[in-house]
Amino acid sequence: KMELILPCLYSELKGDALPKIVSEIAQTNYLHHIIIGLDQANEKQARKAWTFFEKLETPFTILWNDGPNLKKLDKELQKKALAPNEKGKGRNVWYCIGMSIARNSARSVALHDCDIKTYDRRMLAKLFYPVVNPLFNFEFCKGYYPRVADNKMNGRVSRLLVLSLIHI
């Protein structure tokens, strides 16, 4: 059973990338469940997010990170020094992974960004393939995708690798 984690900001629902990502994922038939970590959303926006993600053909859960239930959980975990210290994508992913563990039904979990403008559902298949193929002995896979816009390379790979090579 394959589960996907999508950490996103509410603002990404109106961007160029996430609507395409949801449309592409809706065309897959192998996901068992999707966990969506929703950041920077008030109650009205969280309801809109639910409607937005209903386009998915796969059952999903939205973790509303700014909602009362997660805030209460975060406070309890803070007291025990078990909660992430800072808000952001890391915290979002941390709680989504916790939800996946609590659900206890996934055999493999994939995670990817929600701002990939060049997204194609084959990216998701390529991300899962090494860990779900029984002929391979992989337990972890990290995928990279090009971030090219306006005839220039963007993103982490460009910033951390290419630019550092140029400055040598």
Model feature map: region roles:
Residues 137-156:
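Short beta-strand-to-loop element that shapes/binds the nucleotide-sugar donor at the catalytic cleft/hinge
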Residues 45-104:
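Active-site-proximal specificity loops/subdomain of glycosyltransferases
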Residues 105-117:
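Short beta-strand-to-loop acidic/aromatic patch adjacent to the donor-nucleotide binding site
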Residues 119-142:
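Conserved donor-nucleotide/metal-binding helix-loop-beta segment in metal-dependent transferases, i.e.
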Residues 166-168:
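Conserved small/polar residues in nucleotide/adenosyl-binding loops
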Residues 31-42, 63-65:
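Short beta-strand/loop segment that forms part of the nucleotide-sugar
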Residues 1-26:
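N-proximal low-complexity "stem/linker" segments adjacent to membrane-targeting elements
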Residues 9-14, 41-43, 116-119, 147-150:
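Short acidic, S/G/P-rich loop/turn micro-motifs used as interaction or catalytic elements
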